Design a protein with these regions (language model features):
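Short S/T/G/P-rich N-terminal loop/turn motif that feeds into the first structured element of a domain
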Residues: 2-134, 177-190
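Catalytic cores of eukaryotic secretory-pathway lumenal/extracellular enzymes that build
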Residues: 168-169
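Short, flexible helix/strand-to-coil boundary loops that buttress conserved ligand/catalytic motifs
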Residues: 152, 161-164
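Short amphipathic alpha-helices within nucleic acid-binding modules
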Residues: 80, 144-157
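Acidic, glycine-rich flexible loop segments
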Residues: 128-141, 145-149
Length: 190
């Protein structure tokens, strides 16, 4: 009887995990994409990003998870804290942004795959811009493109966004999907 309880509890826990971890809503609908882009109007141009690139990414939604590759050049100089008015290191504001971003990412079925700091210059690069002295990189797993939209609309994320802007001198991000990986998914390890 005890074995049944243990295995039953384990199966229930795994089932609940999969309900949270996997996308059960399918790809985005055109109306969802239009509503999101209308809400974000004006935000793309302020950072030099393209609404057309975002639209193409959202319209190509296959309902699967993706991993965002983020390269960040952090602001290591002093900047004015928008909350206190005091001078703080920009990198501290970037860390404060991360403290808001991570819970919102988890709530939406995402998690970091890997975050690290840069330890050298470009080793293999051609036909690309010069290294802007990236500081950190992150691989952030998103359950779906819909969840990315929900995260961007999350009030905690939106409130923390000024910290990201002040704590970041440059950033370069693009979505990816796994082709080959020795990273074992939590679907297997949980």
């Amino acid at each position: 009887m005890t074995a049944w309880i243990i295995w039953g509890t384990a199966l229930l826990a795994y089932g609940l995990f999969r309900l949270w971890y996997d996308n059960w809503s399918g790809p985005l609908k055109p109306a969802e994409i239009d509503a999101f882009l209308a809400q974000m109007a004006g935000r793309f141009e302020g950072t030099g990003n393209s609404q057309q690139v975002m639209r193409a990414f959202l319209e190509a939604d296959d309902g699967r998870e993706f991993v965002m590759l983020n390269l960040v050049k952090a602001q290591m100089e002093q900047v004015e804290d928008p909350k206190t008015g005091q001078m703080v290191q920009g990198f501290d504001l970037l860390k404060r942004y991360s403290q808001r971003f991570m819970p919102a990412l988890f709530r939406n079925g995402g998690h970091p795959g890997m975050v690290g700091r840069k330890v050298g210059g470009y080793i293999d690069a051609w036909n690309t811009e010069a290294d802007p002295d990236w500081t950190v990189f992150g691989l952030m797993r998103y359950r779906s493109r819909r969840d990315m939209i929900k995260l961007v609309r999350d009030p905690a994320f939106m409130e923390g966004h000024p910290d990201k802007l002040l704590g970041t001198l440059a950033t370069f991000s693009f979505p990816t999907q796994r082709v080959v990986s020795f990273y074992v998914s939590p679907r297997v390890t949980v």
